[in-house]
């Protein structure tokens, strides 16, 4: 399926974006190995998260999916209750699922194969294979990409590990393995990354130690069931935040969005560029802060993106670069080589698309230089990447003509009702097949 957009006359209204994808995946995994029943409200029913649910079910976890209410009811099997799955576990398009499950499965008393779609089978896994091997795991792969064959070892040993890059997925993988290891596992990061796993471990009553740069867990503990309500995903909210910011006449409100400080890079950077964003009704529930976000149109200026904001914005850069494309002046992003190993090479995909829409964009090995200008209509390719697809749908709100975005089926992995909500606030996005359009 493709997207077809026409320019918007302005965004308005109030919407609630779906539950946070990262928190949803971690919550159901920890609930599955906890003792007792956990109800997960606000679970994101996207394809990536449902792949995680399916994998856990295949290992014996009882998970009732109430899809129309975004609720899961999980009967935890305890730390040692998982069983060998009957076949390979398919993680679909989800890098989070395969890396979290690798950590969980490294310490089990059975062997497992983890695989995924063609995109996932290109994603780098050496970053988890190496430290898990240091803990005593044995993992076979060809070229350090999926499929992964994990030979479970219930006698893992805790390690002290310095992450070569700020990566919440790698950190979380090792923390999960550390739950099953003898002794203490400590992970030190070069810069803060999202800390949902740490917050959820605390929510499920698992003791951990944390300082400014390191997090430690000791093996042998237990997780206790605890109901949880998932906040709205700020990565999904970011598309509407940018769309309202760049489109004249816009004013929207996004309700109950997760505002975890390790995820606020997109708001921090947009404010540096001159955005009019107000965060109100701040509350904290289930260890995660939540707030309403009000956004009004504003004129933006280009900036040099500070390196310390890169890990806090890593999933939002595709749509942030749309903001940069219409800002006055030049925006420079560096220290973001991680964007090249996402669902697609997001640096190359964004530069290609922006150039096709008339924007001067230059690719760097670890980033991009964008000279703000005027977005023209045209046709771009999402390269089967959900965030690229939605980012260019946002570009279509301000472009001088219609924008066609190719290959948008993967939006269902993270935001199944994106088109519905986009049109509700006035973005003018239509899903089309063949050569159809508005």
Curated annotation (Swiss-Prot):
GO CC entries: cytoplasm
Kindly give the SUPFAM superfamilies that the UniProt entry links to this protein.
Answer: EPT/RTPC-like
Enzyme Commission identifier(s): 2.5.1.19
Catalytic activity annotated for this protein?
3-phosphoshikimate + phosphoenolpyruvate = 5-O-(1-carboxyvinyl)-3-phosphoshikimate + phosphate
| A Pfam entry, by short name | EPSP_synthase
Alphabetical UniProt keywords: Amino-acid biosynthesis, Aromatic amino acid biosynthesis, Cytoplasm, Transferase
Which residues bind 3-phosphoshikimate per the record? 21-22, 26, 167, 169, 315, 342
Where are the membrane-spanning stretches?
Answer: none
Task: Return the HAMAP family for the record.
Answer: EPSP_synth
Q: What is this protein called?
A: 3-phosphoshikimate 1-carboxyvinyltransferase
Name the species this protein comes from: Coxiella burnetii (strain Dugway 5J108-111)
